[in-house]
């Protein structure tokens, strides 16, 4: 199997459309869409599926995964729009468009270094804070929290993927068994994080989201 065998799947675009719609309805503060924030989890799941499919296809075709090429492709896809948005926000902030410039500087750094979700967790902010009325005018970069989690996944997962393949070869363990163990471990990660560090940690923290 090669990269070219991964054909376009319209059903995935349909899921994306549904996820976008419910998130937009949620942020529009429609009373009947209180669970719309779960659309973000759909995006994370789709990203994990697609990225893993690409890695599996590349490994099947070439016998390895070129992490540097993977990172380059992800950067070309994500960074241009992200940096344009950051630059525009900085220009508008310099013109006095936003309040709380100190916090905005912190948020810009969190977005640039792809740790925005950890910035939010460390500041003690909740998801309710970024969905409050007029929050977008006070914190124009809050949407970077989900992008940061995706970017962290993109950095880590190819290396973990290669490590798992090497482990399976050395131990003569089937990949399916190894994946099953990982699923079992991660299935309890989010509840444990929520129990020990609270529900906000389960929402912001990357390990809980990967789970």
Regions found by a protein language model. Give the residues of each.
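Membrane-interface helix/loop caps of multi-pass membrane proteins
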Residues: 1-211
């Amino acid at each position: 199997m090669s990269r070219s065998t991964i054909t376009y799947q319209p059903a995935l675009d349909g899921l994306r459309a549904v996820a976008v719609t419910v998130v937009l309805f949620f942020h529009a503060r429609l009373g009947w869409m209180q669970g719309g924030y779960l659309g973000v989890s759909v995006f994370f799941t789709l990203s994990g599926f697609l990225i893993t499919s690409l890695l599996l296809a590349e490994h099947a075709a070439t016998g390895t995964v070129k992490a540097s090429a993977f990172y380059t492709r992800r950067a070309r896809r994500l960074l241009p729009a992200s940096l344009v948005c950051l630059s525009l926000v900085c220009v508008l902030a310099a013109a006095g468009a936003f309040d709380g410039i100190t916090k905005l500087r912190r948020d810009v750094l969190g977005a640039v270094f792809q740790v925005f979700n950890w910035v939010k967790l460390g500041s003690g902010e909740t998801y309710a804070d970024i969905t409050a009325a007029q929050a977008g005018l006070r914190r124009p970069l809050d949407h970077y929290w989900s992008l940061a989690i995706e970017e962290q996944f993109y950095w880590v997962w190819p290396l973990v993927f290669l490590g798992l393949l090497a482990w399976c070869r050395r131990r003569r363990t089937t990949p399916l068994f190894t994946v099953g163990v990982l699923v079992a471990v991660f299935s309890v990660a989010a509840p444990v994080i929520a129990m020990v560090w609270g529900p906000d940690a389960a929402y912001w923290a990357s390990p809980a989201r990967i789970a």
